[in-house]
């Protein structure tokens, strides 16, 4: 994922006493201890040296943002997501769904309000470290010229072949990969033209699975995918969501019914929020969307 962000991001910001991410040894009865070894556990390291376990508690408080200052795209957005929760964003094109995800990644800085990650203002976290704690499965999956194994390995650069195979199994990608003549050694082109849309999405899920981040962002594919592949994708996503904070940009309401909270956005504001059943009872915009009285575009 870092390679993707390198393409999208500006020059590396200097270290000015900001919070960074470090590997730690985690024991039940002892404080966290920083280590250079591979442990599978990470913590935020404050400038004073204090270690805070990486969990994935994300909060927006009265966030105001515009791509140009005089035109607001988000107006006083407040939300929270705790580890293990799935939050879905629903709304028409231009409502602000993708913008919220961009701010979680800190692709842009907000005009006012606060965004915190495990209680730490994202402005105080090194961008590279912040994004190492996130994984994205987006509509247009980024693939690179190289083998299937290498493309999955972008989620964790030191991953072993065994870890790659296990991640592919979790993502329900192993079955189609092993049917290819060269299996995991199959060469891919940068545009992924030798794979179907569904297969590219399964590889993106495998890449997220191997990264094992506390926060997942899913932008559902809007293009047509056959029913069997769609079921594989949904099952793969369910497998890697467990225990993590998950944000979903929803294009089909059938996939968000089990969300802990659904936020209906319109013109940069949250006009409704609640569970699927709660929103149906309100008989508002979500009810209109679900019953076909109003359509997403």
Describe each model-derived feature in a short phrase.
Residues 9, 21-297:
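ABC-type nucleotide-binding domain
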């Amino acid at each position: 994922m870092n390679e993707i962000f390198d393409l999208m991001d500006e020059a590396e910001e200097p270290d000015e006493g900001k919070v960074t991410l470090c590997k730690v040894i985690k024991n039940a009865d002892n404080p966290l201890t920083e280590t250079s070894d591979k442990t599978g556990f990470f913590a935020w390291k404050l400038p004073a040296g204090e270690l805070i376990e990486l969990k994935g508690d994300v909060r927006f408080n009265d966030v105001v943002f515009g791509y140009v200052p005089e035109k607001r795209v988000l107006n006083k957005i407040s939300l929270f997501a705790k580890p293990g929760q799935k939050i879905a964003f629903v709304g028409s094109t231009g409502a602000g769904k993708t913008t919220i995800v961009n701010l979680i990644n800190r692709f842009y800085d907000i005009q006012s309000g606060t965004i915190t990650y495990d209680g730490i203002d994202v402005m105080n976290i090194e961008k590279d470290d912040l994004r190492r704690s996130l994984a994205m499965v987006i509509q247009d999956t980024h693939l690179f010229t190289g083998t299937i194994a290498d493309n999955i390995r972008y989620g964790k650069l030191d991953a072993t072949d065994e870890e790659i195979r296990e991640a592919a199994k979790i993502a329900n990608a192993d079955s189609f990969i092993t049917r290819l003549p060269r299996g995991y050694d199959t060469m891919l082109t940068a545009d992924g033209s030798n794979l179907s849309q569904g297969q590219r999405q399964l590889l993106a899920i495998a890449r997220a699975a191997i990264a094992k981040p506390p926060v997942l962002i899913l932008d559902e594919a809007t293009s047509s995918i056959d029913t069997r592949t769609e079921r594989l994708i949904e099952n793969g996503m369910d497998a890697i969501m467990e225990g993590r904070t998950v944000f979903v940009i929803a294009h089909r309401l059938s996939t968000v019914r089990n969300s802990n909270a659904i936020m209906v956005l319109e013109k940069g504001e949250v006009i409704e929020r609640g569970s699927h059943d709660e929103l149906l009872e309100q008989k508002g915009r979500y009810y209109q969307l679900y019953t076909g009285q109003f359509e997403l575009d």
